[in-house]
């Protein structure tokens, strides 16, 4: 039941992000083995262009952000102390893509430099063997929608375990960012 709730919440979050991507640039990929089996990746990594990298253990759920012990690190090149780290961020990004595509780093970096990130990844992943496939948002049934929308298994804190479900909501704290999906 917990994985159903978290998977449903992820689907809602992805759809909310896509709805606010007017240029169609948001991409989420899932790695697959040579035989086509999905690879479970527990790591949480966010790379924004050559400007920011975040690596850590926290998840985008209330339990992780408020109740569990998590450790994240972020390098933001907009901060003076991190100036000049853009090439390092790009190398990490390209190395991760190369690993999941089972290709040499140099080839991945060259194709992305020539074609751009999205076009480069789309070109490089069109091959047999290990690859990246776009994350597809699953269709949610009524139970999954209820789990996602009401945080039944992911209250914001211990005090909310007994709060009426009608007062809960996946994006309640993020309304200023996303609004209701």
Residue positions per predicted region:
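PLD/PLD-like phosphodiesterase catalytic module centered on the HKD motif
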Residues: 1-181
